[in-house]
A protein has these predicted regions:
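Membrane-proximal helix-turn-helix segments that form the acceptor-binding/catalytic region
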Residues: 77, 102-106, 119, 129-146
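A short, well-ordered alpha-helix in the C-terminal region of glycosyltransferases
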Residues: 319, 326, 333-348, 354-357
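N-terminal strand-loop element at the rim of the active site
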Residues: 10-70, 75-76, 95, 99, ...
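Acidic donor-binding loop of glycosyltransferase active sites
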Residues: 260-276, 289
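Conserved acidic donor-binding segment of nucleotide-sugar-dependent glycosyltransferases
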Residues: 305-306, 310-317, 326-332
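A conserved mid-protein helix/loop that constitutes part of the nucleotide-sugar donor-binding site
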Residues: 16-23, 198-214, 231-234, 275, ...
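Nucleotide-activated donor-binding/catalytic signature segment of Leloir-type glycosyltransferases, i.e.
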Residues: 236-259
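Donor nucleotide-sugar binding/catalytic pocket of nucleotide-sugar-dependent glycosyltransferases
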Residues: 141-180
Length: 367
């Protein structure tokens, strides 16, 4: 009997993304997924994700503290003893993945690296200091193949890493935070706008608050939820306290509450000043909710204006307010965009479709 193709996925971060990918890939090949104990189940309950075909998951303590002295070597052995045909890693500026990629460089194994942010964000986020830049360079130089999320991200990667000689291909960012099938759907609350995520400056919270001020002055019925942690919550905390239509949630949000938040929104706002792709966008579509988003980075590769959301120029509060008003005041438009979000989730952002294309790439690079 022929040996089945084997893929090892090393994911100290992006646990939900990696688990959904592994579950879809397992229909085509044997998969071993290595996760970080700190990251697994933090944002989403992995037990809620359907996995019709079994695969092997190893959860290790990956830290630079004493406990990581055992977990880190074990995680490397998890990869090597699986005897994979391909190893797939995520780029994140930390020492675990950089060390594994350089170790694997001593072998003939193909090394696939998913680059989530080809260019660091302008204000805040990871990859914005010299140490993280060096780690990113180490990982990219050790990769035999790079995947990014969308065609615009290929251009960004080529600009950021002009000396990279391997192949770069697009593999879309699949849906996240999809509610379990047994859950009762949450009905959208009339006029509710959700702004969700890690609150760094590039996310455009200041632009969003300016747009909410405009909606209030125009008398547009709305309520906005700003949910997440980060420095911008502290910077704009007092301002939000004085805005009656805003409910700010600066606290940990459980997976169940996160799903309910997305479903309760009529529209999700992503007024990013710059972006590659967005897990928040993937989560909005995973919950069949349309978006009003900035036309920047890889977002227009996923959001088709007037189909599954509305696109606006970045840092333009008036354009953002106008687009939000259109969705909130037109039931037919809101319904059409919601259907478009559902179709996108079932189409280009469906993990089965993504895994099928990735598996073809794995076979090709391993041949």
């Amino acid at each position: 009997m022929a040996r089945r193709f084997r893929v090892a996925i090393y994911a100290p971060h992006f646990a939900e993304y990696s688990y959904r990918l592994a579950a879809a890939l397992a229909k085509h090949c044997d998969v071993r997924l290595v996760l970080n104990r700190k990251d697994a189940n933090q944002q989403w309950n992995l037990d809620w994700i359907p996995a019709p075909s079994p695969f092997d998951t190893r959860i290790r303590d990956l830290s630079l503290r004493r406990s990581g002295a055992i977990g880190l070597p074990r995680s490397f052995l998890d990869i090597l003893t699986f005897r994979p045909d391909v190893v797939h890693c995520h780029e994140c500026p930390e020492y675990f993945t950089a060390g594994l990629m350089e170790l694997l460089r001593l072998t003939s194994l193909p090394r696939i690296l998913t680059v989530h942010d080809a260019i660091p964000h302008s204000e805040g986020g990871s990859g914005t200091n010299t140490s993280e830049e060096r780690l990113r360079e180490r990982m990219r130089s050790a990769a035999t193949h790079v995947t990014v999320h969308g065609q615009s991200c290929i251009a960004d990667f080529s600009s950021a890493s002009p000396d990279y000689r391997g192949e770069v291909t697009s593999s879309m960012h699949g849906v996240l935070m999809v509610p379990p099938a047994h859950n009762t759907p949450v009905k959208a609350t009339d006029g509710r706008i959700l702004f969700f995520g890690r609150m760094w400056a590039y996310k455009g919270l200041d632009v969003f608050l300016d747009a909410i001020d405009l909606l209030s002055k125009r008398g547009v019925h709305h309520q906005a939820i700003v949910a997440g942690r980060g420095p911008e919550m502290a910077r704009f905390g007092k301002r939000m306290e004085n805005m009656p239509s805003i409910n700010a949630i600066d606290a940990y949000i459980s997976p169940a509450d996160t799903s309910a938040l997305f479903q309760s929104a009529e529209v999700v706002a992503l007024p990013y000043k710059d972006a590659s792709q967005s897990g928040v966008l993937a989560s909005a579509f995973g919950n069949c909710r349309p978006v009003v988003a900035s036309a920047t980075g890889g977002i227009p590769d996923v959001v088709t204006d007037g189909v599954n959301g509305l696109l606006v120029p970045p840092s333009d509060a008036t354009a953002l307010a106008n687009a939000l008003e259109r969705v909130l005041t037109s039931r037919s438009l809101a319904a059409s965009l919601t259907d478009g979000a559902h179709q996108t989730a079932a189409g280009s952002l469906n993990w089965d479709h993504i895994a099928e294309r990735l598996f073809a790439t794995y076979r090709r690079v391993a041949s």
